[in-house]
Amino acid sequence: MSGIPFVRDLEFKYGAVAQVSPLVRRVVAENPGPFTYLGTGVYIIGRGDVAVIDPGPMMEDHFEALKAALKGERITHVLVTHSHMDHSPLAHPLAKWAGCKVYAAGSAIPSESEVRMEAGDDLRFAPDVVVKDGDVFKGSNWTIEAITTPGHTSNHVCFALKEENALFSGDHVMGWSTTVISPPDGHMGDYFASLEKIRKRGFSTIWPTHGPPITDVAPFLDAYITHRQAREQMIIGRLKAGDTLIPKMVEVIYKDVDKRLHPAACHSVLAHVIHLVETGKVKADGPFNLTTEYHPLAAA
């Protein structure tokens, strides 16, 4: 049902540094998986004085690959899009090695779910400097702007490279898949607002942390938003059909998906249901969880 023009082909070699644009290099960590796709792509911005975006997992071979890629250069900023285990654990070791600071939009809210979502929360992570929307970081030949994008997590932030009109999107937008939104740290209403915020900026290229770049940005973001809206209409349809419990909805909506993924799908549907309650389309009989019953309202 998605209609999203996914891009999934990426030529790379684990641990090798690749020049992917005039100002951007990438090193991919060897941590492939169902949520990380081919692995965590670490971006190095500039030459000489550089910024590093999403250093990735704490893997010794990956750390050594980054050191080799950065030999003879000076890291001025370590930038983290959000505190998940595939993005942030190497941030402080890398910053300590380089003698610089770690910048991010705060720490994570611990998950209340027993279902492992993505690589897990990096609960030990806290930035040296908390970034705010619109903060600007400069190097000798690059300018990066922080754009706060809560939704996937409460502390998610993207980074815009002004010289190339490019966005480093973390997990906010991914070319190979849709993004996981898992309450309470994930919030669908915030996610919709953050997608629209990015769409209005008119970026030429989006570089997700996982997978290849998105180069046809406007149609891709439109499809991303339309997919989420269609999912909410499907949920309303199931509620009107009498499926008042989220697990029952998931059995129908995700009938063609591996049942082992249904627990994670339940949390995605919960995020949508919370948004529908907040926008006056659905009523909850209790707290927001998987055992509460939900009902459509006239506005739906």
Where in the sequence are the language-model features?
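Residue-level signal for inorganic ion chemistry
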Residues: L23, L66, H210, I235, ...
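Histidine-centered divalent metal-coordination motifs
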Residues: L79-H87, H152, H210, H272
